[in-house]
């Protein structure tokens, strides 16, 4: 269990907030605009998840080809072949959950692209929709969050990867339980995920 999860389990939201603020004092605002790299996402999840770009889904025949240990961090390419919008996919006893920090439905980020841009980035088909429909047809419930955890109005906010990493680190929680945990800290969600990911990455660096 990650250190911050242990703090929350033992002391609740207020204890977690105090611990995170002590560990990450003074640098959160700047880093809310600093996106995580795929290496950061892999490190935060200790390699126990798949990390894919959207074009990787083209070859997938089912969600079994997408998920690793029931999790996948999925990068929609919206800017270049290495940059875009992070989302998460979880398989739990309750079914498959798609997590977008903006609260968008699966494949909504594809609508941000012109047809020409989509083809250039090899995102001309709705492959995730295809795979989720297949899972649903096989009897596996599929859901997605409709709540925006990430600030929508701030164009400088680049916390989607941080949101996805935190949600995937809490794949044992239901989405309402996860939302309740965030709310219990008294922080807005962008501040929370920035402090958590900064603290975890710094802790890993110290141990290296």
What label would you give each PLM region?
Residues 38, 42, 64, 129, ...:
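Generic detector of well-ordered alpha-helical segments enriched in charged/polar residues
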Residues 144-208:
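Active-site or metal-binding loop neighborhoods of secreted/extracellular toxin and effector enzymes
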Residues 74-169:
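Cysteine protease-like catalytic core of ubiquitin/ubiquitin-like
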Residues 1-96:
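Cysteine protease catalytic domains with a Cys-His-Asp triad
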């Amino acid at each position: 269990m990650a250190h911050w999860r242990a703090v929350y389990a033992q002391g609740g939201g207020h204890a977690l907030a105090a611990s995170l603020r002590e560990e990450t004092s003074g640098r959160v605002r700047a880093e809310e605009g600093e996106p995580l790299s795929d290496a950061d996402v892999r490190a935060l999840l200790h390699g126990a998840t798949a990390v894919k770009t959207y074009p990787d889904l083209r070859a997938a025949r089912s969600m079994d080809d997408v998920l690793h240990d029931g999790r996948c961090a999925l990068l929609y390419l919206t800017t270049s072949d290495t940059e875009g919008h992070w989302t998460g996919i979880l398989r739990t006893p309750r079914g498959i959950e798609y997590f977008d920090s903006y609260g968008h439905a699966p494949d909504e980020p594809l609508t941000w692209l012109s047809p020409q841009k989509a083809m250039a980035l090899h995102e001309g088909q709705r492959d995730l929709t295809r795979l989720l429909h297949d899972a649903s047809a096989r009897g596996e419930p599929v859901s997605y969050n409709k709540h925006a955890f990430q600030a929508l109005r701030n164009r400088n906010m680049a916390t989607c990867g941080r949101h996805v990493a935190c949600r995937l680190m809490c794949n044992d929680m239901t989405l309402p339980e996860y939302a309740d945990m965030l709310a219990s800290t008294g922080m807005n969600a962008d501040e929370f995920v920035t402090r958590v990911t900064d603290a975890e990455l710094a802790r890993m660096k110290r141990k290296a």
